[in-house]
Every structure is written in structure tokens, then in C-alpha cells.
Regions:
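Conserved alpha-helix/loop element of class I SAM-dependent methyltransferases that forms part
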Residues: 41-65
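A short acidic, Gly/Pro-enriched loop at the edge of an enzyme's catalytic core
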Residues: 125-135
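Rossmann-like AdoMet/SAM-dependent catalytic core
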Residues: 210-303
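Conserved SAM-binding loop of SAM-dependent methyltransferases across substrates and taxa
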Residues: 76-87
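Conserved class I S-adenosyl-L-methionine
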Residues: 164-199
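A short glycine-rich, Lys/Arg-flanked "PGG" loop and its adjoining helix->strand segment in the class I
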Residues: 149-161
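Conserved SAM-binding strand-loop segment of SAM-dependent methyltransferases
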Residues: 112-124
Length: 304
């Protein structure tokens, strides 16, 4: 799997890195790993939460069995742990923050989740061998690196031919509401966010680490960029990745009245990138819907 021998510390494969941006991001997450677990979380609760989430449930179904999956920017490995439960897949949880991975590793050990490997390192280092993973997941991470496009190109080197890559990025238009809240947060403080941030309203008020982790990630991150649908489509074209679908869908006018849960299911079904006008409209509509209220993240699925 690796091009070089790692140090193994507390069941985590550790590679040293010196990149300044990576070091800055690592330091940012050190005290408040993201996403953090609820106090009561265990194997059963992670499965329950994952199965209740249309995106994660259908992602797991789409992946199937007997696959090698790399999650880049795994954080505390909630998704990696969920994807590893109840199948014979091999999951690699990859992040630059050792403290975050340690939380995920301890959770896996405590709950006897054995088909998961934890790797600490920088995406720009030559850590993994090429063409070894069936799925590469990079949801909400590439826009926190020093170069979104270069990090994407690096990640697909590790993807097998006919493998799938799922990329999630902040949207230039769809993130407007979060950016607006960010400015008000600087003036009004945390209490304002507890009332007006829809994600924080859902979190148990006693789960302070989880609350603090969300606030830091969404409103105080030192390295952050936003992108458009067309930027990702151009990146897919440049790297010879076939477009499968997106969420929200590029095909604004082809919406058959399905709710957002149904639209998330369609992320894993072959669609069309539509035309420029439809793509712009879809991104504008994000502002007024759930994706726009919860951070403005959009997803693109591609095939190598």
C-alpha cells in the first residue's frame, strides 16, 4: 500500500510532513478534532446515524462489498468507521491530524471494527502506491489544502481504472449564508450561532466538543476556498474523469419534483452535466435550500 515505511504509533501509520499549509491546518484541528463524536456514541449509534442519513446510507450501498476505499480528510473517522461496519471492505482513513485519527482509532478498537487502517500524513507527499483503491472519498477537505486542483490530481493517482472518486467542496454561491453568519459571529459571538446555525440547533447542548468543533470548522478555519460546478467539470475533463452526477443536481429543469433525499439517491445514478445556465441556477437555488443553510457544500461523483 505504501511507498515508504511509516512509523506506527498507537495503531496509526504516521508519515512526517513539513508543508506550512498542512502544518497550519493540523494545528487548527489539534484541540477540536472534527467532526467530534457525541458522548453516547458507540457502534450501534454510528450505524443508526449512518443509515438515517440518505447520503451515507446510499454511499455504502453503492460501494458494495470487497472494495478498497480511501477517505481523504477522514478527521475523527466517523464515516470510515461506518463504512467499515458489516462488510468485507478495506477502509483507509487518511488525515493530517494525528489527534483526530487517534479518536477514530480508539473508537474502532473499542467497538472491534477491524477492517480499517489509519494513516496520518499530507496528501501532497508520495505516501500511497498508484492505482490501488476502488473508491476515493474527498468530501469537504480539498478546499482546506494549499491547492484544490493539485490535491485532486494527486488523489486520483491512487484510484484504480474504473474506480470512483467523490469530491465535496464549498460552493462560491451556495455558501453565501454561512459567510454572512461568519461576519455576524465576529460581532455577536457564539450565542448568535447557537440560535441561527441549523446544524448547531440539532446538536445536544451538552456535547460541547462537538459544538466547538463545528464552529471552528465552519467559521474560523485559516485555510478555506470555494468553487463552482464548472471548475469541477473542467477539472474532471482535464484529468479524464467521467462525470456521473452531482448534488445538488446540475440538471435543474429535469427535477421531477423529488425531495432532497431522493435527489441524494440520484447522486449515484448516471446523469448529465446540463448546460451553463442550469448549473448556475442550481447553485443559486442552493442558497435557499438545505445545502446552503448547512455550509454550502456540493458533491460531484466521477469515474476514472
Amino acid at each position: 500500500m505504501f511507498n515508504q515505511e511509516p512509523k506506527i504509533i498507537e495503531n496509526i501509520n504516521v508519515f512526517n510532513f513539513t508543508d506550512l499549509t498542512a502544518t497550519k491546518v493540523k494545528g487548527f484541528y489539534k484541540d477540536d478534532p472534527f467532526p467530534n463524536y457525541e458522548l453516547s456514541d458507540d457502534k450501534a449509534s454510528i450505524v443508526l446515524k449512518g443509515d438515517r442519513n440518505i447520503y451515507t446510507k446510499n454511499l455504502k450501498k453503492f460501494i458494495g462489498h470487497g472494495k478498497k476505499i480511501l477517505e481523504i480528510g477522514a478527521g475523527t473517522c466517523q464515516l470510515s468507521n461506518y463504512l467499515a461496519i458489516g462488510n468485507n471492505n478495506s477502509i483507509t482513513a487518511f488525515d493530517l491530524n494525528y489527534e483526530s485519527l487517534k479518536i477514530g482509532s480508539k473508537f474502532a478498537t473499542k467497538n472491534e471494527i477491524k477492517n480499517i487502517t489509519f494513516v496520518c500524513g499530507d496528501i501532497f507527499d508520495n505516501i500511497f502506491k498508484e492505482n490501488i483503491f476502488d473508491f476515493v472519498l474527498c468530501n469537504g477537505v480539498l478546499h482546506h489544502t494549499k491547492d484544490t486542483y493539485l490535491s485532486f490530481e494527486k488523489s486520483i493517482h491512487w484510484l484504480k481504472k474504473d474506480g470512483f472518486v467523490l469530491v465535496g467542496l464549498y460552493n462560491k454561491i451556495g455558501r453565501v449564508r454561512t459567510i454572512f453568519r461568519k461576519y455576524l459571529f465576529k460581532v455577536l459571538g457564539k450565542n448568535y450561532l447557537m440560535i441561527f446555525d441549523p446544524v448547531l440547533r440539532k446538536i445536544d447542548k451538552n456535547s460541547k466538543p462537538k459544538i466547538d468543533a463545528w464552529i471552528k470548522d465552519q467559521y474560523q478555519h485559516p485555510v478555506e476556498r470555494s468553487h463552482s460546478y464548472d471548475e469541477v467539470l473542467n477539472l474532471f475533463k482535464k484529468t479524464r474523469i467521467e462525470f456521473i452526477n452531482s448534488y445538488p443536481s446540475c440538471e435543474t429543469f429535469q427535477n421531477d419534483g423529488s425531495d432532497k433525499d431522493e435527489m441524494l439517491k440520484k447522486l449515484f445514478i448516471k446523469g448529465k452535466p446540463a448546460n451553463y445556465f442550469e448549473r448556475i441556477l442550481s447553485q443559486i437555488l442552493m442558497i435557499f435550500d438545505r445545502p446552503g443553510s448547512e455550509g454550502g457544500l456540493f458533491l460531484f461523483l466521477g469515474k476514472k
